[in-house]
Amino acid sequence: MNLKAKIRGLKEHPLVQVLANNGGNPRTLVLIEPLWGIPYNLIAPFATLYMYTQGVTDVQIGLILSVTMVVQVFFSFFGGILADKLGRKFTTMMGDFFGWGMACLVWSVSHNFWLFLAAAVLNCFEQINQTAWYCLLIEDARPKDLVGLYTWVNIGGLVAIFFAPLSGLFVNSYSVVPVVRVLYLVFSLTMIAKTIITFKFCHETRQGKIRRAETRNVSVFQMLGEYRHLIPSLLHSRGVLKAVAVSVILYIVNIVNTNFFSLYVTQRLGLSENLLAVFPILNAAVMLIFMVGIQHRISVTKFRVPLWIGLALYGVAALLLIFSPANSVGFVFLYVFVSAVAAALVNPRKDALLQLNINPQERARLNALIMASTIALSSPFGYLAGWLSSVDRRLPFAFTLVLFVIAMLVICRVQEPQVEEKDA
């Protein structure tokens, strides 16, 4: 009876209820997300070292980031148009196949700056998938379940992180380059499989069918021209602008952390490369405990206070990293712990906050416009972070501290969105 009671209690958990109440696309996309998350997290701790070990410098890494972000703006603009004309499902499949499946194939054979740049540019094709994937995930879901769905998306990625020690073990035995080459090849195969599953088990959303019918006889260039009407509506929405501002700041921070954390802890703090696979595990464990055990106890309709607290914790974490003594694993572990709690508070809410502030009828093109704007505004900072790292590896993280303070000031002026029960 005790076991049955526990199973019954598990079924009644708010996160389980979110999946139970949102079948079809949301459930399918959440369940197959590990096909992206597992290989991505196996590679992520070593991706920068993979380039650095093969002669790509800090400045070149920053240059790759900035160049690809410019290309991403182009793909992002067309992402919303393609999501309307071709449908959310087909556009998602295209982005997964070319932006990840083919890009990872090129990464698996890259050995110089130009090949790494080519792979990164090909990966920009994934931007057309960003808009379509989010539309496919949420358009047939209930608005009040958005934080829960975004929490599930985060959980899918976090569970995948527990596979990260495998890459650490392989790197310890065979070195970075050959291991990462094989992992990129595996990543290519899993993304092709993900594309096939999306084709088989997902369906076009109601809004996607409407937009596809409305745009059937409208040219791509005419739809591109219609952005001139969408841009003013975007600029006049204070709620959207504030949500976009926070998204831009966190996007820049993610660029810094993803590309320069591994260099900082190995090259400046002197920690072993093998630990790079351990840090994501701690991060994932803390976030999972928080999301499963605590997240649902925080009202899903409250955004401002949890976001502000999360950003404050991010700032504390940045200070811990900046002032970490050399060879001090404890400081870095504490940094990871605090960052994980911050991410659990911030990530689902900043995504849901943005979606609740935009017009559902124009979600695809508005999301594309917002994504393009986010990348465009962030693009100079990849090179800047690379230059800062070349001067002093602490400087990129000091820069993120300033960004967190700015984001906190923005959140202070955000109004709580009205969450309705009707379908999105």
Predicted features by range, described:
Residues 150-168, 371-381:
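Glycine-rich segments within core transmembrane alpha-helices of 12-TM secondary carriers
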Residues 12-71, 239-280:
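Helix-loop boundary and gating motifs at the non-cytosolic
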Residues 76-87, 172, 290-303, 389:
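Helix-to-loop junctions at the C-terminal end of transmembrane segments
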